[in-house]
Regions:
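Catalytic phosphate/metal-binding cores of nucleic-acid and nucleotide-processing enzymes, i.e., regions
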Residues: 4-10, 89, 113
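Short, surface-exposed acidic-centric catalytic microdomains
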Residues: 6-62
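Charged helix-capping and loop-helix junction motifs
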Residues: 8-11, 103-107
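Divalent-metal-activated hydrolytic enzyme cores
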Residues: 32, 50, 54-77, 104-121
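Short catalytic/ligand-binding loop motif for oxyanion handling, primarily in non-cytosolic enzymes
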Residues: 35-36, 99-102
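Short, charged beta->alpha transition segments
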Residues: 76-84
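Short, well-ordered beta-to-alpha junction loops that form the rim of enzyme active sites
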Residues: 94-98
């Protein structure tokens, strides 16, 4: 995922090409939360990142059966902290990730904080 901030300090995000300089900050929320790379292959089955954040859904690593919810939530919180520090106005998130999708844990937390989330393939 990448957080983006217009270098001019203007608000809003323009998808695609722009004449305004953009600062991209690449992040890996799961890694920020303490997970190794590569990580386990958990998915959001039967819910969304909102369900995880609200305590209605847990993320279980299929390879080990371990609950890895705390890593995703912790990573999302660290990502939000960084986004707020740099004044990010939008985030480009990888589609299909339980964390880095618009409907994933990080995507949902960023949207709740008013940061525009753009899903990329």
């Amino acid at each position: 995922m990448s957080l983006a901030r217009l270098a001019t300090g203007q608000t809003g995000c323009a998808p695609g090409a722009t004449e305004e300089p953009i600062v991209l900050v690449p992040l890996y929320p799961e890694q920020l939360g303490g997970m190794p790379t590569p990580r386990t292959g958990e998915t959001l089955c039967g819910g969304t990142g909102a369900d995880v954040l609200d305590g209605r859904l847990r993320l279980i690593a299929p390879e080990t059966g371990k609950d890895v919810t705390e890593f995703h939530v912790k990573g999302a919180r660290h990502t939000l902290e960084i986004a707020q520090i740099i004044g990010a106005q939008c985030a480009y998130l990888k589609a299909g990730s339980p964390s880095c999708d618009r409907d994933g844990v990080t995507g949902e937390l960023l949207r709740r904080a008013g940061i525009e989330v753009i899903r990329v393939p």
